[in-house]
Regions:
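Long, amphipathic alpha-helical stalk/connector segments used for oligomerization, subunit docking
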Residues: 122-187
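Alpha-helix capping and helix-loop boundary segments enriched in small/acidic/polar residues
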Residues: 8, 48-49, 65-77, 99-108, ...
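Active-site-adjacent bridging/hinge elements
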Residues: 49-60, 82-93, 128-130, 187
Length: 187
């Protein structure tokens, strides 16, 4: 696999980070600056991003690399975590008041990480030529939202039912949950 050849070690991924940032639009100087503040460490699990807590420390990108190198799954996760580290680094070093470190918030850092992850193939020089790519991405986004919303909608309906039926038995609750789930999911 291409990723295994490119990234046989955590150090190889770390060395390529400025190049990845340039491909994502950062100037060479800015890319080198940001990447110099991120250290890549091996992980037993899938990966994790831990931001530095004070200037002078490095953010840590933990990623799994096997003895055969980084497989695509590990690469995809590492690119996502790299997005977190970039946000954490900018967030720490480019603010004028330390107490604002960590702001905006988790939703913002996740959005940036997913932007990085979405471009993982571009970073490898692999172009997706599927003419349906945008349409499929839209369907994926709609389904992902519906999966989250569907669970929430069901929770709300079950709680409304529970308040309306405070003396319900477990069997009645089960029956109501199944009926409500069908109503929510079969819209």
């Amino acid at each position: 696999a291409k990723t295994q050849k490119l990234y046989p070690t955590p150090a190889a991924f770390e060395k390529d980070m400025p190049n990845m940032l340039r491909k994502l639009g950062w100037s060479p100087e800015r890319a080198s600056y940001i990447a110099s503040k991120i250290q890549v460490d091996p992980a037993r699990g899938s990966g994790h991003a831990a931001g530095a807590q004070m200037k002078g420390d490095k953010a840590r990108l933990r990623t799994r690399i096997t003895d055969k190198g980084m497989n695509y799954k590990g690469y995809n996760i590492a690119v996502h975590e790299f997005g977190h580290n970039v946000e954490q680094t900018i967030d720490l070093y480019d603010i004028d008041y330390y107490m604002l470190q960590g702001v905006p918030n988790t939703a913002f850092t996740e959005a940036l990480a997913f932007l990085f992850q979405k471009r993982d193939l571009d970073l490898l020089g692999i172009k997706e030529n599927n003419p349906d790519k945008e349409h499929l991405a839209s369907l994926d986004a709609i389904w992902s939202c519906y999966e989250i919303m569907g669970v929430s909608l069901l929770d709300m309906q079950v709680w409304k039912w529970l308040y309306a039926n405070p003396d319900a038995t477990p069997a009645q609750l089960k029956e109501a949950v199944i009926r409500l789930a069908k109503e929510v999911w079969n819209l």
